[in-house]
A protein has these predicted regions:
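S-adenosyl-L-methionine-dependent DNA methyltransferase catalytic core
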Residues: 1-26, 36, 66-76, 85, ...
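Conserved hydrophobic/aromatic beta-strand scaffold that supports enzyme active sites
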Residues: 122, 208-210, 226-228
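A short acidic, often aromatic-flanked loop/helix-cap motif at beta-alpha or helix-coil junctions
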Residues: 108-111, 213-218
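Conserved S-adenosyl-L-methionine
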Residues: 181, 203-215
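Intrinsically disordered, low-complexity regions enriched in proline, serine, glycine
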Residues: 186, 209, 238-239
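A short catalytic or substrate-binding loop motif that flags glycine-/basic-rich loops and adjacent residues
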Residues: 43, 218-221
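Core alpha/beta nucleotide-donor-binding catalytic domains of modification enzymes
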Residues: 1-171, 181-193, 200
Length: 301
């Protein structure tokens, strides 16, 4: 049983499926409308709005507005903004919210709404306030507890876990964190250590990895930091867990040869359809992207 917090489009579920693991996503936590609608398409297919075909716009708004959803992943969408959307779009949103069993805004979740018997809780919390890219825009707030920013939503996971424990419910057996490797930098290390200490206090054993996607067959170099947290019922289990991680160190595994880019991208631009798709996918011309381009020797060849 898996719960995906900050689920986005469901990359964790996709990985479990690819690995052939028997799993069930019992809930997701995602307030970004585009993200959970995409999640529904990717994992469940075309939206089924049949149960809601007779819902009026007013009925849909009465259900959607209290959920505190977002259209940009940054700020809550207002009732006025939601009302401007077509009734068909609102039906798709409501259908996706229900079919993904979405608990919505993580700030509204507690031990009462969090499911029981959870094996794995994943939490790829927002990276904008931790990333080097954010630092370029003078954003250094990171995961400070009082930052009141997107990356600081990490501490909502702490709140939920504490409320579960204090009210006698079972904690998830495993936690899986993923974020940018800058979380280990001098600026953010003390906060990250605080988080690890809090998890240990709750009874978890933590193992941190920094891994490059290119070492696992991906056609790109993407370094990310992961933390696996294992709930320990007793000290004997801790000895076993420590030995397991020692024997199965992901940072020491044999590196796989990256797959060729052509396997993932349609690069035959003599095909007018592929060329048009490539043109549409070009990133917007912004000052920050120009700065990146001009400072990259490979792109500027």
């Amino acid at each position: 049983n898996v719960v995906e917090a900050f689920s986005g489009i469901g990359s964790q579920a996709k990985a479990l499926k690819k690995l052939g693991i028997d799993y069930k996503v019992v809930n997701i936590l995602e307030w970004d409308i585009s993200a959970f609608v995409a999640y529904d398409f990717i994992h469940n297919g075309a939206p089924d709005i049949t149960p809601y075909k007779n819902f009026t716009k007013l009925e849909l708004l009465e259900r959607l507005v209290p959920l505190n959803l977002s259209s940009d992943g940054k700020n809550p969408i207002s009732r006025i903004a939601l009302k401007a959307w077509s009734v068909e779009a609102l039906r798709i949103i409501w259908a996706a919210y229900n079919r993904t069993r979405n608990l919505g805004d993580i700030q509204k979740v507690d031990y009462l709404t969090f499911p029981s018997n959870v094996d794995v809780l994943t939490y790829s919390f927002p990276c904008q306030d931790l990333s080097i890219g954010g630092a370029w825009h003078n954003n250094h707030s990171g995961i400070d507890r009082d930052a009141n920013n997107r990356s600081g939503l990490l501490w909502e996971v702490e709140r939920i876990l504490e409320s579960i424990q204090m009210n006698g419910k079972e904690l998830p057996r495993f936690l899986l964190m993923e974020n940018v490797s800058n979380i280990l930098s001098k600026r953010h290390a003390s906060n990250f250590n605080d988080w690890k200490n809090q998890l240990e206090r709750l009874g978890y054993y933590n193992k941190v990895y920094t891994l490059d996607a290119s070492n696992f067959g991906s056609p790109q170099r993407r370094v990310r930091t992961f933390m696996v947290s294992v709930l320990l019922p007793n000290n004997d289990i801790q000895t076993f867990v420590e030995q397991y991680f020692k024997d199965n160190d992901l940072e020491e595994i044999a590196k796989k040869k990256p797959k060729k880019l052509e396997r993932f991208l349609r690069m035959d631009y003599s095909n007018p359809i592929y060329k048009e798709e490539a043109n549409i996918s070009n990133p917007n011309d912004t000052p920050s992207r120009r700065k990146i381009y001009e400072g990259n020797d490979i792109l500027n060849k």
